[in-house]
Amino acid sequence: MEKRIKLGLFGFGCVGQGLYDVLSHSEGLKADIEKICVKDRNKKRKIDAKYFTYDKEDILGRKNLDVIVELIDTSEAAFEIVTRAMNNGVSVVTANKKMLAENFEELFHLQEKNNVALIYEGSAGGSIPIIRNLEEYYDNELLSSIRGLLNGSCNYILTRMELENMDYNKALKMAQEQGFAESDPWLDVAGYDTLYKLILLTVHSFGLILKPEQVLALGIQNISFDDITYAKEKGYRIKLIATAHKVGNKFRVYAMPHFVSKESDLYSVLYENNGVEVEGAYSCKQTFVGKGAGSHPTGSAVLSDISALTYQYKYAYKKLKKLREQHNGNFDAGTLLDTDFEIKVYIRFANKEALKGIEIVSVEEEFKSSKTNYIIASVKFKSLFSLKGNRDSKLFVCAV
Protein backbone atom coordinates (compact mmCIF):
# COMPACT_ATOMS: atom_id res chain seq x y z
CA MET A 1 0.00 0.00 0.00
CA GLU A 2 1.35 3.42 -0.97
CA LYS A 3 2.37 5.53 2.00
CA ARG A 4 0.43 8.74 2.56
CA ILE A 5 2.73 11.67 3.20
CA LYS A 6 2.07 13.92 6.17
CA LEU A 7 2.22 17.69 5.75
CA GLY A 8 2.56 20.56 8.18
CA LEU A 9 1.22 23.80 6.68
CA PHE A 10 2.04 27.35 7.73
CA GLY A 11 -0.46 29.90 6.44
CA PHE A 12 -4.02 29.58 5.21
CA GLY A 13 -4.43 32.71 3.14
CA CYS A 14 -5.00 32.89 -0.60
CA VAL A 15 -2.34 30.32 -1.58
CA GLY A 16 -2.86 28.10 1.47
CA GLN A 17 -6.56 27.77 0.72
CA GLY A 18 -5.76 27.17 -2.93
CA LEU A 19 -3.42 24.34 -1.96
CA TYR A 20 -6.08 22.83 0.30
CA ASP A 21 -8.61 22.92 -2.55
CA VAL A 22 -6.38 21.36 -5.21
CA LEU A 23 -5.06 18.75 -2.76
CA SER A 24 -8.63 17.82 -1.82
CA HIS A 25 -9.40 17.09 -5.47
CA SER A 26 -6.08 15.47 -6.36
CA GLU A 27 -6.43 11.87 -7.51
CA GLY A 28 -2.71 11.16 -7.75
CA LEU A 29 -1.00 12.53 -4.66
CA LYS A 30 -1.67 10.71 -1.39
CA ALA A 31 -1.10 13.40 1.23
CA ASP A 32 -2.74 14.62 4.40
CA ILE A 33 -2.42 18.01 6.08
CA GLU A 34 -1.85 17.19 9.74
CA LYS A 35 -1.88 20.72 11.11
CA ILE A 36 -2.19 24.29 9.82
CA CYS A 37 -0.52 27.09 11.77
CA VAL A 38 -2.23 30.51 11.49
CA LYS A 39 -2.11 33.83 13.38
CA ASP A 40 -5.70 35.08 13.54
CA ARG A 41 -7.83 33.11 16.00
CA ASN A 42 -11.02 34.98 15.08
CA LYS A 43 -10.95 34.61 11.30
CA LYS A 44 -13.68 32.39 9.87
CA ARG A 45 -12.31 29.46 7.87
CA LYS A 46 -14.01 26.89 5.69
CA ILE A 47 -12.55 23.75 7.28
CA ASP A 48 -12.80 22.17 10.72
CA ALA A 49 -11.09 24.07 13.54
CA LYS A 50 -9.37 20.87 14.71
CA TYR A 51 -6.84 21.27 11.88
CA PHE A 52 -5.63 24.66 13.11
CA THR A 53 -3.02 25.66 15.64
CA TYR A 54 -1.66 29.04 16.70
CA ASP A 55 1.65 27.70 17.99
CA LYS A 56 4.38 27.00 15.44
CA GLU A 57 5.87 24.36 17.77
CA ASP A 58 2.83 22.16 17.12
CA ILE A 59 4.28 21.69 13.64
CA LEU A 60 8.02 22.27 14.02
CA GLY A 61 8.13 19.99 17.06
CA ARG A 62 6.40 17.06 15.38
CA LYS A 63 8.52 14.07 14.44
CA ASN A 64 6.11 12.39 12.01
CA LEU A 65 5.94 15.04 9.27
CA ASP A 66 7.37 14.30 5.83
CA VAL A 67 7.15 17.83 4.41
CA ILE A 68 6.64 21.31 5.82
CA VAL A 69 4.85 23.77 3.54
CA GLU A 70 5.47 27.46 4.25
CA LEU A 71 2.91 29.88 2.77
CA ILE A 72 2.92 32.91 5.09
CA ASP A 73 3.38 36.59 4.23
CA THR A 74 6.27 37.77 6.38
CA SER A 75 9.77 36.91 5.20
CA GLU A 76 11.42 36.98 8.65
CA ALA A 77 9.01 34.47 10.20
CA ALA A 78 9.14 32.35 7.04
CA PHE A 79 12.93 32.23 7.22
CA GLU A 80 12.80 30.96 10.80
CA ILE A 81 10.29 28.25 9.87
CA VAL A 82 12.22 27.10 6.82
CA THR A 83 15.64 27.04 8.47
CA ARG A 84 14.39 25.20 11.56
CA ALA A 85 12.64 22.61 9.43
CA MET A 86 15.75 21.98 7.32
CA ASN A 87 17.98 21.82 10.39
CA ASN A 88 15.57 19.19 11.73
CA GLY A 89 16.07 17.17 8.55
CA VAL A 90 12.67 17.94 7.00
CA SER A 91 12.29 19.03 3.38
CA VAL A 92 10.35 22.23 2.71
CA VAL A 93 8.09 23.67 0.03
CA THR A 94 7.69 27.46 0.04
CA ALA A 95 6.21 30.18 -2.15
CA ASN A 96 7.84 33.07 -0.28
CA LYS A 97 9.96 34.75 -2.95
CA LYS A 98 11.01 37.66 -0.70
CA MET A 99 12.39 35.32 1.96
CA LEU A 100 14.21 33.26 -0.66
CA ALA A 101 15.73 36.25 -2.46
CA GLU A 102 16.93 37.89 0.75
CA ASN A 103 18.51 34.72 2.18
CA PHE A 104 19.37 32.53 -0.79
CA GLU A 105 23.04 31.95 0.01
CA GLU A 106 22.31 30.61 3.49
CA LEU A 107 19.35 28.54 2.30
CA PHE A 108 21.45 26.96 -0.43
CA HIS A 109 24.09 25.90 2.09
CA LEU A 110 21.48 24.54 4.53
CA GLN A 111 20.13 22.23 1.84
CA GLU A 112 23.61 20.87 1.23
CA LYS A 113 24.49 20.62 4.93
CA ASN A 114 21.32 18.79 5.99
CA ASN A 115 20.77 16.78 2.80
CA VAL A 116 17.21 18.06 2.46
CA ALA A 117 15.30 19.71 -0.36
CA LEU A 118 13.91 23.24 -0.54
CA ILE A 119 11.48 23.46 -3.46
CA TYR A 120 9.86 26.75 -4.54
CA GLU A 121 8.28 26.60 -8.00
CA GLY A 122 5.24 28.54 -6.78
CA SER A 123 7.44 31.49 -5.81
CA ALA A 124 8.60 32.44 -9.29
CA GLY A 125 6.08 32.10 -12.09
CA GLY A 126 2.68 31.32 -10.66
CA SER A 127 1.43 28.20 -12.42
CA ILE A 128 4.30 28.19 -14.97
CA PRO A 129 6.84 25.43 -14.14
CA ILE A 130 9.73 27.67 -15.11
CA ILE A 131 12.23 26.69 -12.41
CA ARG A 132 11.79 22.98 -13.11
CA ASN A 133 12.35 23.65 -16.81
CA LEU A 134 15.48 25.68 -16.11
CA GLU A 135 16.76 22.93 -13.80
CA GLU A 136 16.03 20.01 -16.12
CA TYR A 137 15.35 20.95 -19.74
CA TYR A 138 17.88 23.80 -19.86
CA ASP A 139 20.41 22.42 -17.38
CA ASN A 140 23.09 21.94 -20.06
CA GLU A 141 21.95 24.74 -22.39
CA LEU A 142 24.03 27.88 -22.86
CA LEU A 143 21.36 30.43 -22.08
CA SER A 144 21.77 33.96 -23.36
CA SER A 145 18.71 35.57 -21.79
CA ILE A 146 15.56 35.15 -19.77
CA ARG A 147 12.88 37.81 -19.62
CA GLY A 148 9.30 37.84 -18.60
CA LEU A 149 6.14 39.12 -17.00
CA LEU A 150 6.41 37.76 -13.48
CA ASN A 151 3.73 39.74 -11.64
CA GLY A 152 0.13 38.92 -12.47
CA SER A 153 -1.19 41.88 -10.48
CA CYS A 154 0.73 44.45 -12.53
CA ASN A 155 -0.13 42.78 -15.80
CA TYR A 156 -3.80 42.76 -14.80
CA ILE A 157 -3.69 46.48 -13.97
CA LEU A 158 -1.91 47.41 -17.21
CA THR A 159 -4.30 45.32 -19.30
CA ARG A 160 -7.36 46.92 -17.71
CA MET A 161 -5.93 50.39 -18.26
CA GLU A 162 -5.17 49.76 -21.93
CA LEU A 163 -8.13 47.68 -23.10
CA GLU A 164 -10.85 49.24 -20.96
CA ASN A 165 -9.61 52.84 -20.70
CA MET A 166 -9.51 52.45 -16.93
CA ASP A 167 -7.46 54.70 -14.67
CA TYR A 168 -4.70 53.24 -12.50
CA ASN A 169 -6.47 53.50 -9.13
CA LYS A 170 -9.62 51.78 -10.37
CA ALA A 171 -7.63 49.00 -12.04
CA LEU A 172 -5.60 48.50 -8.85
CA LYS A 173 -8.77 48.30 -6.77
CA MET A 174 -10.16 45.64 -9.10
CA ALA A 175 -6.92 43.66 -8.82
CA GLN A 176 -7.27 43.78 -5.04
CA GLU A 177 -10.92 42.71 -5.19
CA GLN A 178 -9.94 39.74 -7.37
CA GLY A 179 -7.29 38.71 -4.85
CA PHE A 180 -4.42 39.41 -7.27
CA ALA A 181 -2.97 42.35 -5.30
CA GLU A 182 -2.52 42.83 -1.55
CA SER A 183 -4.28 45.53 0.47
CA ASP A 184 -0.84 47.18 0.58
CA PRO A 185 0.21 46.70 -3.06
CA TRP A 186 3.63 48.40 -2.82
CA LEU A 187 5.75 45.27 -3.33
CA ASP A 188 3.74 44.43 -6.45
CA VAL A 189 3.43 47.82 -8.14
CA ALA A 190 6.90 49.13 -7.20
CA GLY A 191 8.54 46.14 -8.89
CA TYR A 192 9.87 44.36 -5.81
CA ASP A 193 7.81 41.20 -6.26
CA THR A 194 9.15 40.98 -9.82
CA LEU A 195 12.67 41.65 -8.52
CA TYR A 196 12.55 38.79 -6.01
CA LYS A 197 11.31 36.37 -8.66
CA LEU A 198 13.97 37.54 -11.10
CA ILE A 199 16.68 36.81 -8.53
CA LEU A 200 15.42 33.22 -8.26
CA LEU A 201 15.31 32.75 -12.03
CA THR A 202 18.82 34.17 -12.36
CA VAL A 203 20.13 31.50 -9.98
CA HIS A 204 18.71 28.72 -12.13
CA SER A 205 19.44 30.37 -15.50
CA PHE A 206 23.02 31.53 -14.95
CA GLY A 207 24.15 30.35 -11.51
CA LEU A 208 24.24 33.85 -9.97
CA ILE A 209 23.05 34.46 -6.41
CA LEU A 210 22.31 38.17 -6.40
CA LYS A 211 21.12 40.33 -3.53
CA PRO A 212 17.99 42.48 -3.89
CA GLU A 213 19.99 45.67 -3.36
CA GLN A 214 22.25 44.80 -6.32
CA VAL A 215 19.42 44.69 -8.86
CA LEU A 216 17.43 47.62 -10.26
CA ALA A 217 13.66 47.47 -9.84
CA LEU A 218 11.27 50.16 -11.10
CA GLY A 219 7.52 49.77 -11.02
CA ILE A 220 4.23 51.01 -12.42
CA GLN A 221 3.00 52.94 -9.36
CA ASN A 222 3.33 56.29 -11.17
CA ILE A 223 1.82 55.26 -14.50
CA SER A 224 -0.91 57.44 -15.99
CA PHE A 225 -3.32 57.05 -18.86
CA ASP A 226 -1.10 59.44 -20.85
CA ASP A 227 1.65 56.81 -20.81
CA ILE A 228 -0.74 54.09 -21.98
CA THR A 229 -1.99 56.36 -24.77
CA TYR A 230 1.52 57.24 -25.96
CA ALA A 231 2.49 53.56 -26.08
CA LYS A 232 -0.65 52.62 -28.03
CA GLU A 233 -0.03 55.38 -30.57
CA LYS A 234 3.45 53.96 -31.19
CA GLY A 235 2.16 50.37 -31.49
CA TYR A 236 3.37 49.22 -28.07
CA ARG A 237 1.97 47.84 -24.86
CA ILE A 238 3.50 48.71 -21.51
CA LYS A 239 4.58 45.65 -19.54
CA LEU A 240 6.60 45.25 -16.34
CA ILE A 241 9.46 43.08 -17.59
CA ALA A 242 12.13 41.22 -15.65
CA THR A 243 15.33 40.79 -17.67
CA ALA A 244 18.56 38.86 -17.22
CA HIS A 245 20.86 38.53 -20.20
CA LYS A 246 24.48 37.79 -20.77
CA VAL A 247 26.72 40.39 -22.42
CA GLY A 248 30.21 39.04 -22.91
CA ASN A 249 31.33 37.70 -19.55
CA LYS A 250 28.90 39.84 -17.56
CA PHE A 251 25.17 40.00 -16.95
CA ARG A 252 22.56 42.75 -17.15
CA VAL A 253 19.80 42.04 -14.65
CA TYR A 254 16.91 44.42 -13.92
CA ALA A 255 13.14 44.78 -13.67
CA MET A 256 11.27 47.80 -15.05
CA PRO A 257 8.39 48.76 -17.35
CA HIS A 258 9.03 48.27 -21.07
CA PHE A 259 7.38 49.26 -24.31
CA VAL A 260 6.65 45.83 -25.82
CA SER A 261 6.06 45.53 -29.57
CA LYS A 262 3.58 43.26 -31.35
CA GLU A 263 6.49 41.12 -32.55
CA SER A 264 7.16 39.94 -28.99
CA ASP A 265 5.36 36.89 -27.61
CA LEU A 266 4.87 38.83 -24.38
CA TYR A 267 2.72 41.44 -26.16
CA SER A 268 -0.30 39.13 -26.13
CA VAL A 269 0.08 37.99 -22.50
CA LEU A 270 -2.82 39.78 -20.81
CA TYR A 271 -4.60 40.22 -17.48
CA GLU A 272 -3.22 38.11 -14.59
CA ASN A 273 -1.21 35.84 -16.85
CA ASN A 274 2.55 35.52 -16.64
CA GLY A 275 4.89 34.92 -19.54
CA VAL A 276 8.55 33.93 -19.62
CA GLU A 277 10.88 33.92 -22.65
CA VAL A 278 13.99 31.75 -22.46
CA GLU A 279 16.64 32.03 -25.17
CA GLY A 280 19.56 29.68 -25.61
CA ALA A 281 22.38 29.03 -28.04
CA TYR A 282 20.84 25.79 -29.31
CA SER A 283 17.19 25.76 -28.27
CA CYS A 284 16.63 29.33 -29.56
CA LYS A 285 13.69 31.20 -28.03
CA GLN A 286 10.84 29.52 -26.20
CA THR A 287 7.95 31.16 -24.38
CA PHE A 288 5.99 29.86 -21.41
CA VAL A 289 2.59 31.35 -20.53
CA GLY A 290 0.27 30.64 -17.61
CA LYS A 291 -1.71 32.11 -14.73
CA GLY A 292 0.49 34.34 -12.60
CA ALA A 293 -1.87 35.21 -9.77
CA GLY A 294 -4.73 33.64 -7.93
CA SER A 295 -5.35 31.02 -5.29
CA HIS A 296 -5.63 27.86 -7.37
CA PRO A 297 -2.87 28.46 -9.96
CA THR A 298 -0.24 29.04 -7.27
CA GLY A 299 -1.74 26.31 -5.10
CA SER A 300 -1.33 23.87 -7.98
CA ALA A 301 2.35 24.82 -8.32
CA VAL A 302 2.86 24.17 -4.60
CA LEU A 303 1.09 20.82 -4.93
CA SER A 304 3.43 19.89 -7.79
CA ASP A 305 6.40 20.66 -5.54
CA ILE A 306 5.01 18.46 -2.77
CA SER A 307 4.48 15.67 -5.29
CA ALA A 308 8.09 16.02 -6.51
CA LEU A 309 9.35 15.42 -2.98
CA THR A 310 7.64 12.02 -2.92
CA TYR A 311 10.29 10.82 -5.37
CA GLN A 312 13.18 12.57 -3.57
CA TYR A 313 13.41 15.46 -6.03
CA LYS A 314 16.00 18.16 -5.32
CA TYR A 315 17.29 21.06 -7.35
CA ALA A 316 20.71 20.15 -8.73
CA TYR A 317 21.92 23.77 -9.07
CA LYS A 318 24.28 22.68 -11.86
CA LYS A 319 24.95 26.18 -13.16
CA LEU A 320 25.50 27.62 -9.70
CA LYS A 321 27.99 24.90 -8.79
CA LYS A 322 29.76 25.12 -12.14
CA LEU A 323 30.17 28.90 -11.85
CA ARG A 324 31.57 28.54 -8.34
CA GLU A 325 34.05 25.94 -9.52
CA GLN A 326 35.22 28.38 -12.19
CA HIS A 327 35.80 31.00 -9.47
CA ASN A 328 37.37 28.59 -6.95
CA GLY A 329 34.50 28.56 -4.48
CA ASN A 330 32.44 31.39 -3.05
CA PHE A 331 32.45 34.80 -4.73
CA ASP A 332 30.30 37.90 -4.93
CA ALA A 333 28.05 37.44 -7.94
CA GLY A 334 27.64 41.22 -8.00
CA THR A 335 31.10 41.48 -9.56
CA LEU A 336 29.64 39.84 -12.67
CA LEU A 337 26.88 42.44 -13.01
CA ASP A 338 27.16 45.02 -15.78
CA THR A 339 25.60 48.32 -14.73
CA ASP A 340 27.87 50.57 -16.79
CA PHE A 341 25.81 50.98 -19.95
CA GLU A 342 23.28 53.32 -21.53
CA ILE A 343 19.61 52.49 -21.83
CA LYS A 344 16.94 54.21 -23.93
CA VAL A 345 13.93 55.24 -21.86
CA TYR A 346 10.67 57.15 -21.92
CA ILE A 347 10.36 59.46 -18.90
CA ARG A 348 7.21 61.38 -18.01
CA PHE A 349 7.74 64.17 -15.50
CA ALA A 350 6.09 67.23 -13.99
CA ASN A 351 9.15 69.49 -14.16
CA LYS A 352 12.83 69.30 -15.06
CA GLU A 353 13.81 69.39 -11.39
CA ALA A 354 12.27 65.92 -11.03
CA LEU A 355 14.90 64.56 -13.45
CA LYS A 356 17.69 65.44 -11.06
CA GLY A 357 19.83 62.41 -10.34
CA ILE A 358 19.24 60.76 -13.72
CA GLU A 359 22.29 61.07 -15.97
CA ILE A 360 20.88 61.93 -19.39
CA VAL A 361 23.31 61.29 -22.24
CA SER A 362 21.17 62.43 -25.18
CA VAL A 363 17.55 63.35 -25.87
CA GLU A 364 15.86 61.90 -28.95
CA GLU A 365 12.37 63.33 -28.46
CA GLU A 366 10.82 65.89 -26.11
CA PHE A 367 7.24 66.97 -25.51
CA LYS A 368 5.92 69.69 -23.21
CA SER A 369 2.36 70.78 -22.48
CA SER A 370 0.29 72.09 -19.61
CA LYS A 371 -0.95 68.54 -19.05
CA THR A 372 2.15 66.39 -19.38
CA ASN A 373 5.85 66.39 -20.23
CA TYR A 374 7.97 63.53 -21.47
CA ILE A 375 11.29 62.77 -23.11
CA ILE A 376 12.74 59.83 -25.00
CA ALA A 377 16.38 59.74 -23.97
CA SER A 378 19.47 57.62 -23.53
CA VAL A 379 20.51 57.61 -19.88
CA LYS A 380 23.19 56.03 -17.75
CA PHE A 381 21.60 52.83 -16.47
CA LYS A 382 23.33 53.07 -13.10
CA SER A 383 21.73 56.45 -12.40
CA LEU A 384 18.24 54.89 -12.41
CA PHE A 385 19.02 53.29 -9.05
CA SER A 386 18.22 56.71 -7.53
CA LEU A 387 14.54 55.97 -8.30
CA LYS A 388 14.43 52.47 -6.81
CA GLY A 389 12.01 52.30 -3.89
CA ASN A 390 11.52 56.07 -3.93
CA ARG A 391 7.96 56.62 -2.72
CA ASP A 392 8.26 60.39 -3.25
CA SER A 393 9.18 60.27 -6.91
CA LYS A 394 6.37 60.95 -9.38
CA LEU A 395 8.38 60.01 -12.47
CA PHE A 396 7.27 57.21 -14.73
CA VAL A 397 10.20 55.52 -16.47
CA CYS A 398 9.82 52.91 -19.19
CA ALA A 399 12.46 51.19 -21.32
CA VAL A 400 11.98 51.78 -25.04
What spans do the regions from the language model cover?
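Glycine-rich adenosine-cofactor-binding loop
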Residues: 6-21
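Rossmann-fold NAD(P)-binding glycine/threonine-rich loop
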Residues: 79-84, 97-134
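Conserved anion/nucleotide-ligand pocket segment
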Residues: 136-202
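NAD(P)-binding Rossmann-fold cofactor-contacting core
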Residues: 26-46
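Short acidic low-complexity segments
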Residues: 51-62
